């Protein structure tokens, strides 16, 4: 059986739950475009049950139809409740990929539900929700076991088999508190996958600094059990508390670790050369600096100072570097304009607007068309509360109707 490992990026759902951080809907859309360019399998785009997400989600589904997003699956997240599933499809009828989530550990069932639900109730609610999702047209369905790492293995097997019977395509094993270690999760996932033959999706948090190692180890356990495996990532590791498994670090580990690259077949569509672009944009959009030591994309990822290291790197970079800056899309000089600058935005006029777009090689048929795009640029600048990037300006010009829907938050 040919199995592979796929990446499901959850930046637009879990990453945006980072406390004290906001991400505009336009920025979420740009991340989906970059994830698609990177070859990532799926993006968890948000909550179809939330009113302020409806236009953004539907606009991104329109973007798929328009060919702006080519391969990336757009997946919504909701609770494993039939009423949530029903509301998701009422709000976003074009949704074809979904993950439904419920707590499975004794501490969460007791702590959250305060005696109102038992283990049997949890499984039954998940089963009914999964069946309904499939009936409503879901093509790929993931069923999430929240706090799986503190759930007994026999319970997880029961949960996964019930999900499989209901039509689920995979089970998400959530190490919600980052409590698992690589050896333990490898053993648990291998046993779970062998017992159920259900593809396993790893969702690991970084509370103990092991999210990447734990995710990869768990995926290896699934892979060795001859089922497809999935790793949830976020760009730059953003997420609740100490964050999630970092997208770029995970790809680097799977591509360049001597043992892993021989054991696990990473999705062939992954294009690592887009790493710098997506990490840099996410840092700008979230307003969170990239740590200087971040693998692949940090300022010091390819920096050498000590005598022995500098001498070795100059003679043969393989002495002290596993990969080249070019492998992650770095190495080219990035110019900073220091002379006269004409920008366009919230208070921009037609002349400055046309000048900015001329520099991008984009022209307009007439003033009427230009004024329409200018108005969207003004609203987009107000929406993001920061200067628009060149790629954002290009996107607005190419898909004005979709952008207009994204910028209207109230449905």
PLM features: what roles do these ranges have?
Residues 27, 31, 53-56, 84, ...:
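General structural feature for long, well-ordered alpha-helical segments within catalytic domains
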Residues 42-46, 73-76, 142-144, 172, ...:
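Short catalytic-loop micro-motif centered on adjacent basic/acidic residues
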Residues 4-5, 9-11, 252, 261-411:
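A mid-to-C-terminal "edge-of-domain" accessory segment
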Residues 52-66:
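Glycine-rich loop at the start of a catalytic domain that most often binds anionic cofactors/ligands
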Residues 10-13, 48-50, 77-81, 101-105, ...:
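Active-site beta-loop-alpha junctions enriched in small/polar residues
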Residues 5-7, 17-41, 62-68, 82-198, ...:
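Alpha/beta enzyme core
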Residues 177-319:
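Catalytic alpha/beta core domains of metabolic enzymes, predominantly
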Residues 21, 46, 78, 149, ...:
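Hydrophobic alpha-helical scaffolding
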């Amino acid at each position: 059986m040919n199995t592979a490992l796929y990446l499901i990026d959850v930046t637009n759902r879990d990453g945006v739950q980072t406390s004290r951080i906001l991400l505009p809907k336009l920025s979420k859309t740009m991340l989906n475009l970059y994830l698609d360019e990177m070859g990532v399998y799926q993006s968890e785009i948000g909550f179809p049950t939330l009113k302020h997400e409806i236009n953004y989600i539907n606009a991104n589904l329109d973007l798929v139809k328009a060919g702006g997003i080519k391969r990336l699956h757009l997946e919504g997240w909701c609770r494993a409740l039939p009423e949530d599933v029903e509301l998701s499809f009422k709000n976003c009828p074009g949704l074809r990929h979904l993950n439904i989530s419920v707590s499975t550990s004794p501490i969460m069932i007791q702590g959250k539900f305060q005696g109102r639900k038992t283990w049997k109730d949890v499984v039954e609610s998940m089963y009914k929700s999964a069946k309904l999702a499939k009936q409503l047209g879901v093509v790929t369905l993931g069923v999430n076991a929240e706090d799986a790492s503190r759930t007994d293995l026999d319970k997880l097997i029961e949960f996964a088999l019930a999900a499989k019977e209901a039509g689920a395509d995979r089970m998400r094993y959530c190490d919600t508190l980052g409590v698992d270690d690589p050896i333990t999760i490898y053993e648990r996932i291998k046993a779970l996958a062998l017992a159920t033959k259900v593809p396993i999706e790893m969702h690991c948090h970084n509370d103990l600094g092991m999210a990447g190692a734990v995710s990869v180890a768990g995926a290896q356990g699934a892979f060795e059990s001859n089922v497809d495996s999935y790793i949830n990532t976020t760009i730059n590791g953003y997420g609740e508390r100490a964050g999630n498994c970092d997208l770029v670090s995970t790809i680097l580990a799977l591509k360049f670790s001597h043992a892993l690259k021989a054991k696990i077949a990473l999705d062939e569509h992954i294009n690592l050369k887009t790493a710098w672009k997506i990490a840099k944009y996410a840092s700008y959009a979230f307003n969170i600096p990239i740590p200087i030591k971040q693998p692949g994309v940090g300022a010091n990822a390819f920096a050498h100072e000590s005598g022995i290291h500098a001498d070795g790197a100059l003679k043969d970079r393989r002495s002290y570097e596993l990969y080249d800056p070019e492998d992650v899309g770095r190495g080219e000089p990035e110019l900073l304009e220091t002379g006269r600058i004409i920008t366009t935005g919230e208070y921009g006029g037609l002349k400055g607007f046309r000048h900015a777009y001329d520099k991008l090689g984009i022209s307009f048929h007439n003033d009427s068309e230009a004024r329409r795009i200018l108005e969207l640029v003004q609203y987009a600048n107000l929406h993001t509360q920061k200067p628009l990037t060149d790629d954002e300006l290009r996107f607005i010009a190419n898909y004005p109707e979709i952008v207009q829907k994204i910028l209207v938050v109230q449905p």
